């Protein structure tokens, strides 16, 4: 009970959410994950000349192959869930369904299945369960919530910019900068904090 009270000081879970609503939200997240997995592999296997010029210039195909967008989507799912357990469940199902869409497309449309990568990403999907549980507290109050949200934004900042000042400060990818800015808006603090 002491631990529960400690965590509820950071952020209290919503208790008045019906089971039907939770199921519908989780099913929607599963569908979104599956569609994004198929889209990511489709765009990965599509020649860049097929894509509109703006998507080619933004390097959208490689963007979905890097970590920043997936960290942001997991963070969004986590912080907008009703409780840390729902955050963990929803994020886990998002990644598992995304991997299902990705590797089903790989196997049945493109005709190959990279098992080593698949196993690695499944292990990461299982780890996302625990990370999302912790991430849910990023929208809470106090020093722990500030620390968690700072870690998330720091990881996304490192995806967007070279932070090694001996090599000079420069931007890696424009879309990662946008992703980082979205995370800053998503996890912004009250002025007093």
What are these regions (language model features)?
Residues 20-32, 85-94, 119, 123, ...:
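Alpha-helical transmembrane segments of integral membrane proteins
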Residues 57-71, 116-127, 170-182:
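Alpha-helical transmembrane segments of polytopic membrane proteins
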Residues 46-58, 77-86, 104-115, 135-140, ...:
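Short juxtamembrane and helix-loop transition motifs at transmembrane-helix boundaries
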């Amino acid at each position: 009970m002491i631990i529960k009270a400690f965590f509820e000081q950071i952020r209290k879970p919503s208790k008045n959410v019906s089971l039907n609503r939770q199921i519908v939200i989780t099913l929607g997240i599963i569908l979104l994950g599956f569609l994004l997995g198929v889209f990511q592999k489709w765009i990965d296997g599509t020649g860049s000349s097929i894509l509109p010029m703006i998507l080619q210039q933004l390097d959208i195909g490689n963007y979905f192959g890097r970590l920043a967008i997936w960290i942001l989507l997991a963070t969004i799912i986590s912080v907008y869930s009703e409780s840390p357990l729902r955050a963990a469940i929803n994020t886990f199902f998002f990644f598992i369904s995304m991997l299902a869409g990705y590797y089903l497309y790989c196997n049945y449309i493109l005709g190959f299945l990279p098992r080593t990568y698949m196993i690695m990403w499944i292990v990461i999907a299982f780890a996302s369960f625990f990370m999302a549980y912790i991430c849910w507290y990023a929208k809470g109050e106090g020093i722990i919530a500030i620390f968690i949200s700072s870690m998330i934004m720091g990881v996304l900042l490192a995806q967007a910019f070279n932070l090694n000042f001996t090599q000079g400060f420069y931007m890696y990818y424009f879309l990662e900068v946008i992703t980082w800015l979205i995370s800053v808006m998503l996890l912004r603090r009250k002025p007093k904090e």
